[in-house]
Amino acid sequence: MDQSSRRDESYHETHPGSLDPSHQSHPHPHPHPTLHRPNQGGVYYDSPQHGMFQQPYQQHGGFHQQNELQHLREFSDSHDNAFSHHSYQQDRAGVSTLPNNISHAYGGSHPLAESQHSGGPQSGPRIDPNHHPHQDDPHRPSEPLSHPSSTGSHQGTTHQQYHERSHHLNPQQNRDHADTISYRSSTRFYRSHAPFSRQERPHLHADHHHEGHHAHSHHGEHPHHKEQRHYHGDHMHHHIHHRSPSASQLSHKSHSTLATSPSHVGSKSTASGARYTFGARSQIFGKAQSRESLRESASLSEGEDHVQKRKKAQRAHKKAHTGNIFQLLWEKISHLLLGLQQMILSLTQSLGFETFIFIVVCLNTVILVAQTFTELEIRGEWYFMVLDSIFLSIYVLEAVLKLIALGLEYFYDPWNNLDFFIMVMAVLDFVLLQINSLSYSFYNHSLFRILKVFKSMRALRAIRVLRRLSILTSLHEVAGTLSGSLPSITAILTLMFTCLFLFSVVLRALFQDSDPKRFQNIFTTLFTLFTMLTLDDWSLIYIDNRAQGAWYIIPILMIYIVIQYFIFLNLVIAVLVDNFQMALLKGLEKVKLEQAARVHEKLLDDSLTDLNKADANAQMTEEALKMQLIEGMFGNMTVKQRVLHFQFLQLVAAVEQHQQKFRSQAYVIDELVDMAFEAGDDDYGK
């Protein structure tokens, strides 16, 4: 096998889809042309963009002689720019330089029909009845085929071999043949370009779907695509192809050759067709690029929007997550604080805490009493200071715990207010001592000298003992009575002070000269009258003033003593006693109320029990009640006694029934008698 056949086989192995497997057993040989002479026609189109064209009729059985295509342009990059659009005007004009009769090597003539556009806009497919007649001598598979008029020859491949080799290929590969045609950059050839419409192109080939049946390319310098009509005996092959143009198909499939004479007109047509092709391709490519750029920009904008939304969602999620974390922490802290508050409240209200504070107050009172002794105060000054600091720390801790447990409710209790005031005074005392130890000059400041007065307020801590002795009922009642008597006592003390002021003014005006030591001014006079409330030294006042000739002081002093001592002081005592009595009565009444409540609760429980029993009895049937009644009344009788008692009861019931009938009959008789007498009186009157 020569070089051309080997190239052909390698091409079909690379493009196995270029042949239709339906022609696997075609009986007629067909030469495989390689080169074309310049003045010979023969056009083959295998372009899905442009459809099929009617091919020249060829005579099988001799040497095929074809025109060699003239090279019009040179394409450096034939794979990207190989658009072979054939001129529609040239095809309509039927430009061809093929001779009508060419001698065949086997003694037969090979008539070639004029190339025409199959399925064109004006003429349909024309079929020559003399087309493809077989001559006397058939093709021999081993005979070489040559082109006498061409510049080169090759060992051709018979039609049978061609079909045997190509029809075993895959139909899918056959369809891919048009998409994978490659061109060499050194290939130069002439083409006639023509824009084709999306029309149907017939292909006559024995009712087989034959796409690219003879579309093959010589793997030499010039790729040629042919599409021919063949008449094999009586078999006529006819096929209609429908194709739609696209940019990729224009670039790889629209390769057709139309044999034209090398003329200036053909060159112009070819150039115009190429320009039209490149313009259409550039427009399509520009539109595709614009659409792709729009899609890319839209996709980028959508991606940016998606990223922004995702970032916003992430930020919102982070904020919500942070807020949830803070809320969770706050809830946990609040829960812990609430639990701590409840624990502290239970601690401050416990009996052990009250007992501990009571012991501390008692010890503090003992220390205050011990500090009154000069010798003990001098020797145990350091110890007393340490103990005072410990007591102060305990008082502060108590106040803080109660403030945490009760909050502002701590100040609603007067005893708590007293405790807080004592604690503040103790803190001031401690601060004054510390300032005195640091700087004596600063301690002598007027402000701290005023605060030093409150140091004596430590004695009020002893009152805490009364507060801590609340476990004693009687003492608690006395303290409650005193607190309840304060308004009345305050009113009485106000009257006493008013009376004291009036008597001070009068006594100073009358006895200033006779007794200047006691009645010199209003303050000395007030002090003298206040000491007289105890009835002390009033006789000495009378003696000194009588010696000075002021004997009339006696009635004034007597009036003052009666008003102040016998009236107002007794009023205070009366108020206290009355309040104590009221407190006792309230206590007794409270006890009675508690007893009555207990009795009422017991009665309520009994009534509920009776109601429950009544409900249980109500649920019992009448027969059960009768049986219960009988068992209660006659449970201790024998059977004979019960029978006799039953008969007795029956007789008693019968007697009562007859008595009832007798009464009713007697009533009727009485009515009749009364009516008779009334009727007789009426008749007698008439």
Curated annotation (Swiss-Prot):
Testis-specific. Residues 147-160, 245-271 have a biased composition (Polar residues). Residues 1-57, 97-177, 207-271, 289-318 are annotated as: Disordered. Residues 374-382, 436-446, 511-521, 535-551 are extracellular. Residues 1-15, 128-142 have a biased composition (Basic and acidic residues). Keywords: Calcium, Calcium channel, Calcium transport, Cell membrane, Cell projection, Cilium, Developmental protein, Differentiation, Flagellum, Ion channel, Ion transport, Membrane, Spermatogenesis, Transmembrane, Transmembrane helix, Transport, Voltage-gated channel. It holds the Pfam family Ion_trans. Residues 1-351, 405-412, 470-487, 578-686 are cytoplasmic. It is found in: Cell projection, Cilium, Flagellum membrane. Residues 522-534 dip into the membrane without crossing it. One of its GO terms (cellular component) is plasma membrane. Its main location: membrane. It is a multi-pass membrane protein. Activated by intracellular alkalinization. In contrast to the human ortholog, not activated by progesterone. The chain crosses the membrane at residues 352-373, 383-404, 413-435, 447-469, 488-510, 552-577. GO terms for molecular function: calcium-activated cation channel activity; voltage-gated calcium channel activity. The keyword Transmembrane applies. It catalyses: Ca(2+)(in) = Ca(2+)(out). InterPro entries: CatSper1 (IPR028746), Ion_trans_dom (IPR005821), Volt_channel_dom_sf (IPR027359). Component of the CatSper complex or CatSpermasome composed of the core pore-forming members CATSPER1, CATSPER2, CATSPER3 and CATSPER4 as well as auxiliary members CATSPERB, CATSPERG2, CATSPERD, CATSPERE, CATSPERZ, C2CD6/CATSPERT, SLCO6C1, TMEM249, TMEM262 and EFCAB9. HSPA1 may be an additional auxiliary complex member. The core complex members CATSPER1, CATSPER2, CATSPER3 and CATSPER4 form a heterotetrameric channel. Belongs to the cation channel sperm-associated (TC 1.A.1.19) family. This is Cation channel sperm-associated protein 1. The lineage of its organism: Eukaryota, Metazoa, Chordata, Craniata, Vertebrata. The gene is Catsper1.
